[in-house]
Amino acid sequence: MDYDEKRERLAERLRQELNLSRKVYEAIRKVPRHLFVPESYKNEAYVDTPLPIGYGQTISAPHMVAIMCELLDLREGDKVLEVGTGCGYHAAVTAEIVGKSGKVISIEYIPELAERARAILKALGYDNVEVIVGDGSKGYEKEAPYDKIYVTAAAPDIPKPLIEQLKPRGRMVIPVGDSVQWLIIVEKDESGNVRKKNWGSVRFVPLRGEYGFKSVRYD
């Protein structure tokens, strides 16, 4: 079975299991996950599981990428902040949904991962994704405010700068916690009031940075 067929099967299974919207299904169906994972894991690229990408980091399981995209209610033209580029796969899926009129600003703490992701995204033609090396726990004020924000690593609490950089009527999805983690949906109304909702239990690598966990080691 070739990669295209494996990707089709994965997308169809997720569509049925998660009742995916057409836009999220099409994005998962289109983005070549095998090009984002290390060579030694290419054969497992379309298994619905996280995979190591080096530096103590992982590429999220496809079902979690799909769930986060659905929870964000991504729309064409959205400006999105991604905290934690990793290998760039999640950014590519998001970019497919927001389209050429949208934009994804992705912040990565580890320069080597950022460089690799930037090269893959560029080669695949994702001109609407900008990868920046920096402390994503502080957001990226230069491009704020954002329609949507999502974080791909677990924070001790919701970083204040991310709430501040979210547009009124915007939405954020972020895992919070240490040994026990919860996926939190944050919504900001037109007056700037914030409402939080707990989606459920998840498992992510820890967020590093000023508003992240201080004692994180990368091998």
From Swiss-Prot:
Keywords: Cytoplasm, Methyltransferase, S-adenosyl-L-methionine, Transferase. Signal peptide: none annotated. The active site is at S60. One of its GO terms (molecular function) is protein-L-isoaspartate (D-aspartate) O-methyltransferase activity. The keyword Transferase applies. It catalyses: [protein]-L-isoaspartate + S-adenosyl-L-methionine = [protein]-L-isoaspartate alpha-methyl ester + S-adenosyl-L-homocysteine. It is an enzyme of class 2 (transferase). One of its GO terms (biological process) is protein modification process. SUPFAM superfamilies: S-adenosyl-L-methionine-dependent methyltransferases (SSF53335). It is found in: Cytoplasm. It holds the Pfam family PCMT. Its EC number is 2.1.1.77. One of its GO terms (cellular component) is cytoplasm. Its main location: cytoplasm. Catalyzes the methyl esterification of L-isoaspartyl residues in peptides and proteins that result from spontaneous decomposition of normal L-aspartyl and L-asparaginyl residues. It plays a role in the repair and/or degradation of damaged proteins. Belongs to the methyltransferase superfamily. L-isoaspartyl/D-aspartyl protein methyltransferase family. This is Protein-L-isoaspartate O-methyltransferase 2. It comes from Archaeoglobus fulgidus (strain ATCC 49558 / DSM 4304 / JCM 9628 / NBRC 100126 / VC-16). The gene is pcm2.
